[in-house]
Design a protein with these regions (language model features):
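Active-site helix of classical SDR
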Residues: 126, 162, 170
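C-terminal substrate-recognition "lid" of short-chain dehydrogenase/reductases
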Residues: 2, 138, 178, 219-243, ...
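The beta1-alpha1 cofactor-binding region of Rossmann-like NAD(H)/NADP(H)-dependent oxidoreductases
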Residues: 40-41, 61-74, 108, 221
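Substrate-binding pocket helix/loop in short-chain dehydrogenase/reductase
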Residues: 99-103, 107-112, 141, 197, ...
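Conserved glycine-rich cofactor-binding loop
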Residues: 7, 14-15
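Alpha-helical segment proximal to the catalytic Tyr-Lys
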Residues: 131, 174-179
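Residue(s) in the substrate-gating loop at a strand-loop-helix junction
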Residues: 146
Length: 250
């Protein structure tokens, strides 16, 4: 797909990785809908920077992706504002750090909220955008999962299971939406400078990075570049690419 003039909806577009994805897409000439859940001012700042730096149309849109009615409203507003919708990036996520062995503190309320945002939310969005993309004859969907979805590690069981579900949802939707819409997934490892590492001490980040083959955290720009590649591809679908500096092998 030629990204110049395409319209991309990026959920969590005001976050650390989300911002990099927005910039990478705009750099290719794509117009960007920056979706946020709470930080309107931050999202509007991202949209303004995209518009001024890359001369593209970029706007901020608020949405609680756990709410089906809000998702339908969001897709309608984006389609009306831009006149089309070619790309969906499911980057919005939620987590509560709970050690795997601490099942007493893994409440069903926490489980339900994590699943609602990390798995059901992307499903709602995919269902909402699918008819728009089908009518146009092509579309690209990229889900942002995690290496926690590939092995029983990470900051909580609920988060790991939600990301495992998102990886398999990618495969299932690749089948369901073929041949018009291609669906792929990026599974990052620990990313420095994101919400996930903001709550960690520097020595914790360094210790985690040192356990990777490349002895450093995964790179947000590498992830964003892979998202762009998945949007441009014509023959790749149903795939998950891990970007974690080789930490998954430890």
């Amino acid at each position: 797909m030629d990204l110049k003039g395409a319209v991309a909806l990026v959920t969590g577009g005001n976050g650390g990785l989300g911002q990099r994805i927005c910039h990478a897409l705009a750099r290719e000439g794509a117009h960007v809908a920056v979706m946020y859940a709470r930080s309107r001012e931050q999202a509007e700042g991202v949209a303004g920077e995209l518009a001024s730096r890359y001369q593209v149309n970029a706007r901020a849109f608020g949405c609680d992706i756990a709410d089906g009615a809000e998702v339908e409203r969001l897709v309608g507003e984006v389609t009306q504002a831009f006149g089309r919708l070619d790309i969906l990036i499911n980057d919005a996520a939620y987590n509560v750090a709970i050690p795997f062995g601490d099942l007493d503190n893994l409440t069903m309320e926490a489980w339900d909220k994590i699943m609602a945002i990390n798995l059901t939310g992307p499903m709602r969005l995919i269902k909402a955008v699918a008819p728009v993309m089908k009518a146009k004859g092509q579309g690209r969907i990229v889900n942002i999962a995690s290496v926690a979805g590939l092995s029983p590690t990470g900051s909580s069981i609920a988060y790991a299971v939600s990301k495992a579900g998102l990886i398999h949802l990618t495969r299932c939707m690749a089948v369901a939406l073929a041949p018009d819409t291609l669906v792929n997934c990026v599974a990052p490892g620990l990313l420095d400078g994101t919400r996930a590492t903001a709550n960690l001490r520097s020595e914790q980040v360094e210790r985690a990075a040192s356990s990777s083959l490349l002895k450093k955290p995964a790179d947000k720009d590498d992830c964003a570049d892979m998202v762009v590649a998945m949007c441009r591809t014509e023959t790749m679908t149903g795939q998950t690419v891990v970007i974690d500096a080789g930490r998954i092998f430890h």
